[in-house]
From Swiss-Prot:
GO terms for biological process: defense response. Belongs to the WRKY group II-b family. It comes from Solanum lycopersicum. It is found in: Nucleus. Plants silencing WRKY72A show a reduction of the R gene Mi-1-mediated resistance as well as basal defense against root-knot nematodes (RKNs) and potato aphids. Disulfide bonds: none annotated. This is WRKY transcription factor 72B. It comes from the Eukaryota. Transmembrane segments: none annotated. The keyword Transcription applies. The gene is WRKY72B. One of its GO terms (cellular component) is nucleus. One of its GO terms (molecular function) is DNA-binding transcription factor activity. In association with WRKY72A, contributes to basal defense against root-knot nematodes (RKNs) and potato aphids, as well as Mi-1-mediated gene-for-gene resistance to these pests. Both WRKY72A and WRKY72B are not required for gene-for-gene resistance mediated by Pto, another tomato R gene. Residues 84-132 form a coiled coil.
Amino acid sequence: MENKNKAEYYSPDDEDRDIDNQENIIHQFGKGRKEREDDKSKPSSPHHKDYMNIDNIEGGAVNVMVKRERSPPEHNSMASSSTHKEQDDQLASAKDEMREVMEENQRLRMHLDRMMKEYRNLQNQFHDIVQKETDQKSSSTTVNTSTTHHDHESDQEADQLVSLSLGRTTSDMKKDDLSKILKKDKVHDDEGVSNNNKSLDLGLDCKFETTPTECSPVNYSPENSLDDIQANKDENEETSNKNLKTMRNNGDGDDVSQQNPTKRARVSVRVRCDAPTMNDGCQWRKYGQKIAKGNPCPRAYYRCTVAPNCPVRKQVQRCAEDMSILITTYEGTHNHTLPLSATAMASTTSAAASMLLSGSSNSSDPNPQVTATTTTTPTTTTSANINGLNFYLSDTSKHHKSPYYFPNSSISASAPNSLPTITLDLTSTSSSSPSSLSHLNRMTQNFPPRYNYNNNNSTTNLNFSSVLESNSLPISWTNNYPNQTYNKK
């Protein structure tokens, strides 16, 4: 009842009095204000508000009640909206990045497709090239097999139906070319041969009379032989001119030009060489070898690789009696331009082969017996060293012989049963006098080379200067016909 009465009579003065009492109490209890200040200094929760209520003041004791009320949810909605906005921005940026990545993937896919297409094209081209190379190798293998078989059979058969010339081919020579050759003979008669440098111009040419003449006495002296050659040269030219006119009138010029290439012959070169092959200036590739009878050294077979379809072949074999001697046998006709380093040997062998084929074509025997052995076999070869090389241009039906002279030579004869072969023996070391050199130079003037490889700036003659310093002429011409011999040691 008392409390109710107090509440009923509670006036503004009483309120002021209560406030003063509170301040006094706070001063008395220092902690009270300090705690209140601390409470004020502490951040209140955003969702609550603090209220202080003082109930009673009894005997200096103060009961302070603090009430907290939850604030309205406006601030929470603002925070959630900002969070949703950030998430939307992140989602949009992620979508943009995914779109860029997809576009990049599309570009990479197109680039990969283009690369794959180019790769397939290159692969197809590679397969085509490999297929072509395989076809070429198979065709070349077939040609090599047939060529090897042909070369093996040619060692046992006597066939004269294939041409031999290691210079430029004369199989397509026309009528004008024949007249040019005859004109060159007259030009060489008027020109002198220079002997200042120690080089040997090696050129051979032969002319034959179709009508038989009486056999003149054989004289091996250099003076008589050279005089006979010079005296008979004009007669030979007149006879050749008459024959050429006859061929033109009868239309047989092409037939004659095509008959000589159908002959078959070989040129064998004997040199002292330590290398497996002789350096003749051409490029060769080995395609086989075999052991021949009577010689323990293998015989190697080579083909010319200067041109893809060149038919020239050569055989290389050591001499059975002297292993330091290398025997190289050439066969075939070059169908390409010769390198400068190969013209010397080619012109030399071409002149020898032309002489051999010309001699066989003027023989009355359509199938003469021929020989193809070297002069090193003592059982089948006989030689007589004389002071000169004698060319016996014979008519086998009437046994007519016309001797021609070359200095420092020998005559050889060998057994038959092989192809006609002319041998160049470069292994002789016999000495020669200055007169022999002059006679040889005169003969090279009388018999010029058929193919001229010389020009004003360079010399491609066959040079034996290292041998000439020792006063020797190591050249051998051997035509192994039974009655025709061209030999020089």
